[in-house]
Amino acid sequence: MISALGLEEAQSLFQQLPPALRLATLSPVYVAADATRDSALEPVFLCYREENSFWLHSTHRGRVLDTSWHDLQSAYGYGGPVASSDDPAFTARAWSQYREWCRSSGILAEFVRLHPMAGNERFYCGTILDDRMTVAIPLLGTDPEAAFSTRTRRGIGKAARAGVVAEWHAAEDIRNLFPDFYLRAMEALSADPLHLFPAAYFEALSKLPAVRLMVCRKGGEILSMGIFFWGAEIIEYHLGATSTRGKESYSSHLMFKAAADKGRLDGMRWLYMGGGTNGDADSSLLYFKAGFSDSRFPFRIGYQIIDPVAYDNLRKSLIASGRANLKRILFYS
């Protein structure tokens, strides 16, 4: 049977997982914090247990337009279930109970972005699709810079010669310094509104125990900023921004080098950078990240349709009215 847990109990269970699964963005406290970006999102923490084994799914529930249906989807970044057992039979039993919970709870459909570093598709029995490749820098037992390409090392050198310095700031600066700098950078890029966040979001992030803020500056001018999460073994790059002058001085190159150096000192195994803005192999963002490492991890998405008839009827209705986004599983969002 699936149980809905409170945040404290869910986080306590999460802390019992193997270190490789305890990534910050899969934690219940992150999922709860992320829900502050949209008042329509409700964080839910669902658990299946058998003796000493558990399956835990921290996700967001939202209403489907003006219908009586709800959907489930990952927090910003990644999501999907995690479990203390790798037994496929246990996962199958958990999934059967989860499907029943979805049906009885009025869930129409679910969409998840599975974490490349967790490999948690093994705990998800819905439809799984490959999306794109992502990049991570190895840290354990090696100098991180050994994985850098010549062009990346050259950029780091240019930043250092230009007088750029990288420094860690107190978490409170995630709400004090980061938002305005980030917003200006996103406006300059004409970024999708999906990547814009209210003040409450940064307030919530600043209170997470695993969060750290890196600032690169030259003199008094901020050139780059990045939010990173420290998990049990893996650092995750979450959000960042660079000004025009920062790009000219290669400040973001120095930012990732400094984060990797700190991770190595802390005994972390990986610095996860993510992938490109889409699945294109020639993505400029992927090209930048690929300069830091040749280690690749596949990003996969997962979904399930709980009520196919209702799903298809709504889809047809929105297609007829020109309101359906057919590139999305949750075509109404």
Regions found by a protein language model. Name each.
Residues 77-89, 140-142, 240-249, 277:
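A short, internal acetyl-CoA/4′-phosphopantetheine-binding micro-motif in the GNAT/acyltransferase core
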Residues 1-66, 114-248:
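A conserved beta-strand-loop-helix scaffold within acyl/acetyltransferase catalytic domains
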Residues 61-78:
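Conserved acyl-donor/pantetheine-binding loop and adjacent beta-alpha core of acyl/acetyltransferases
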Residues 96-99, 201-313:
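Aromatic (often tryptophan-rich) hydrophobic motifs at membrane interfaces
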